[in-house]
């Protein structure tokens, strides 16, 4: 139950709901059969005959690129440090927590599938579950001038496109 995080559990039966999984199910429709991005990854893997080895290699390469970008400071201007206070003290979050420092192809190859029993998508080669935030301010030119805001872009046009939710990994 939602209140468990604040009040703890009481005696008796309780039902735990995975809010992330429930969110996917709600967003895609209760009867869609799609309840997680990992399931759609398995669909894409089957459709395009992508091997487990290719998935692991792509994941490894992505981790190495992210690690190199972090180490070289390329993300530093894009991340605003946030102080997180807890009973144990304060922690400054200023680095993407998703890339794993000790990722190897060997370790990736030992992970078991997590979305389908006979699948190939693992916790190591699936899209990560990351905490994060982003925002942008879109306004009129006259408002930006009035408020002395730096104009960094001009919205000329936009399009909306989508793919079959069962294959969301195909999104371009």
For the regions a language model picked out, list residue spans one by one:
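Flexible glycine-/small-residue-enriched beta->alpha junction loops
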Residues: 1-44
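N-terminal extracellular/periplasmic Venus flytrap/periplasmic-binding protein-like
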Residues: 17, 53-146, 151, 156
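Conserved thiamine diphosphate
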Residues: 35-59
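Active-site pocket-lining segment
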Residues: 39-42, 78, 86, 156-172
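Flexible glycine/proline-enriched surface loops and loop-helix/loop-strand junctions
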Residues: 24-25, 46, 118-123
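A short, mixed-charge helix-start or loop-turn motif at secondary-structure junctions
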Residues: 22-24, 48, 158-162
């Amino acid at each position: 139950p939602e209140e468990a995080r604040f009040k703890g559990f009481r005696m008796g039966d309780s039902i735990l709901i995975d809010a992330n999984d429930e969110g996917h199910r709600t967003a895609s429709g209760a009867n869609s059969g799609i309840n997680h991005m990992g399931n759609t990854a398995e669909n894409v893997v089957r459709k395009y005959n992508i091997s487990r080895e290719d998935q692991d290699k792509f994941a490894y390469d992505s981790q190495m690129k992210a690690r190199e970008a972090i180490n070289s400071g390329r993300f530093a201007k894009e991340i605003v440090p946030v102080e997180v206070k807890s009973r144990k003290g304060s922690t400054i979050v200023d680095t993407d927590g998703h890339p794993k420092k000790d990722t190897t192809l060997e370790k990736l190859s030992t992970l078991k599938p997590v979305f389908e029993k006979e699948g190939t998508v693992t916790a190591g080669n699936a899209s990560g579950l990351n905490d994060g935030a982003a925002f942008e301010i879109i306004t009129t030119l006259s408002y930006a001038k009035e408020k002395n805001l730096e104009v960094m872009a001009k919205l000329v046009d936009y399009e909306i496109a989508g793919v079959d939710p069962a294959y969301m990994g195909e999104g371009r």
